[in-house]
Structures are given as structure tokens and as C-alpha cells.
């Protein structure tokens, strides 16, 4: 069974944790930006069907 030989230093642990947090932050920013562009109708990659509010006569 594989066992680490030495304890990971606190600074290395902090660097890895911050990198992991940064990846999550950028994923959230990208998702929010995409949602904003879809809601404003400026998205070029999604086609949203627009429903009209006119009543049929």
C-alpha cells in the first residue's frame, strides 16, 4: 500500500488549497457570465425560444 514518506508542509498545503479555490472561483465567474449573456439575449452559443405575450384573436 502506498504511504507518503513525509508530512506535507503547511505552505505547500496552503498553495494547493488556494489553487483549488481559484479554480472554483473562475468556474463560478464563467457560469455567471454565461447566465447573464443568456438572460440579456447576447449569447451566441445558446438559442432560447422566445414566447410572445400576445393573445390570439
UniProtKB/Swiss-Prot annotation:
GO terms for molecular function: structural constituent of ribosome. Keywords: Chloroplast, Plastid, Ribonucleoprotein, Ribosomal protein. InterPro entries: Ribosomal_bL32 (IPR002677), Ribosomal_bL32_plant/cyanobact (IPR044958), Ribosomal_zn-bd (IPR011332). One of its GO terms (biological process) is translation. The keyword Cell cycle does not apply. It holds the Pfam family Ribosomal_L32p. One of its GO terms (cellular component) is large ribosomal subunit. It comes from the Eukaryota. It is found in: Plastid, Chloroplast. Belongs to the bacterial ribosomal protein bL32 family. PANTHER family: 50S RIBOSOMAL PROTEIN L32, CHLOROPLASTIC, LARGE RIBOSOMAL SUBUNIT PROTEIN BL32C. HAMAP family: Ribosomal_bL32. This is Large ribosomal subunit protein bL32c.
